[in-house]
């Protein structure tokens, strides 16, 4: 018997999940939920499309609902809501708010007797697992995580939701000097700002207040406020020509010492490289 899958949201992530389910012999995609007009959605596999508001009607047809919305505004509401009807999986990645998100989803799942798995992805996700393994192997040490250089889909989505923004890409860029200090075994104490910079390329709507948009980006909590952020306003043509791909990746380091001797330096690292996350 195949596991019956539903997808909530049909952006780049939703299309990627659709392709992954299609290639998994033990999974069956039975429905797609969207906030848009279902008639406007053209899927790769021809799966039936329903309005998000019709979710409750599908509760006996779906075993697991995979949520593919954004962490800024979608998942905080959608995951606990859909957990009333289905076992759910999401990729919530606002690190500072994961405990709060867990509490809300956990409460909804306990009430409905469903199961929720949150923050699945590469970080949080694969990187989280590698931190646990590295900490078990090297308990006397420090963890370091560097993302990029690459396009953060979540941060790009957060920028696109700002009033006056037509399109946006956000690049997360590791600070090379910080990377080198970690690689050298220095075990530095680094602030958020010292580890990464952020660079935004924004297509503004005609007549939009660009100064207001830039201020909204640079002061956005949990996304940009703690980083040195550069904002570039560009044309739609330049966006399509120069920023149509979605490459990303990152590295996790565990640096420390063995046998209680600080001179016996040991390092563990894990890296992901993705040329493009476009489905």
Where are the model-predicted features located?
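C-terminal substrate-binding/catalytic lobe of Rossmann-fold NAD(P)-dependent oxidoreductases
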Residues: 4, 16, 23-53, 151-278
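Hydrophobic Val/Ile/Leu positions in short beta-strands of Rossmann-like dinucleotide-binding domains
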Residues: 5-7, 67
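Glycine-rich Rossmann-fold phosphate-binding loop(s) that bind the pyrophosphate
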Residues: 10
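Hydrophobic/small residue at the entry helix of a nucleotide-binding pocket
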Residues: 13
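Rossmann-fold NAD(P) dinucleotide-binding segment
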Residues: 55-64, 72-91
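General beta-strand structural signal in soluble alpha/beta enzymes
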Residues: 90-91, 116-120, 146, 170
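Rossmann-fold NAD(P)-binding glycine/threonine-rich loop
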Residues: 92-116
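Oxidoreductase and adenylate-handling cofactor-binding alpha/beta cores
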Residues: 126-142, 157-171
């Amino acid at each position: 018997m195949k596991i019956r899958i539903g997808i909530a949201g049909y952006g780049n992530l939703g299309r990627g999940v659709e392709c992954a389910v299609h290639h998994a012999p033990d999974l069956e995609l039975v429905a797609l939920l969207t906030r848009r007009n279902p008639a406007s959605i053209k899927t790769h596999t021809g799966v039936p499309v329903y309005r998000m508001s019709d979710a409750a009607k599908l509760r006996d047809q779906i075993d697991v609902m995979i949520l593919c919305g954004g962490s800024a505004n979608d998942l905080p509401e959608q995951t606990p809501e859909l957990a009333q009807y289905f076992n759910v999986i999401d990729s919530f990645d606002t690190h500072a708010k994961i405990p709060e998100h867990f509490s809300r989803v956990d409460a909804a799942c306990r009430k409905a007797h469903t199961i929720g798995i949150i923050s699945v992805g590469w970080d949080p996700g694969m990187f989280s697992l590698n931190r646990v393994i590295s900490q078990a192997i090297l308990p006397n040490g420090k963890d370091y995580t560097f993302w990029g250089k690459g396009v953060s889909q979540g941060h790009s989505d957060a920028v696109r939701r700002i009033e006056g923004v037509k399109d946006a890409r956000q690049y997360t860029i590791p600070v090379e000097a910080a990377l080198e200090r970690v690689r050298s075994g220095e075990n530095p104490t680094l602030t958020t700002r010292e580890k990464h910079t952020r660079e935004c390329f924004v297509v503004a709507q005609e007549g939009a207040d660009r100064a207001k948009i830039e201020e909204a980006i640079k002061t956005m909590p949990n996304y940009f406020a703690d980083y040195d952020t550069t904002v570039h306003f560009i044309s739609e043509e330049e966006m399509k020509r120069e920023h149509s791909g979605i490459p990303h990746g990152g590295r996790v380091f565990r640096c420390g010492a063995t046998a209680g001797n600080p001179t016996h330096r040991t390092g563990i690292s894990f890296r992901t490289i993705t040329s493009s996350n476009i489905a």
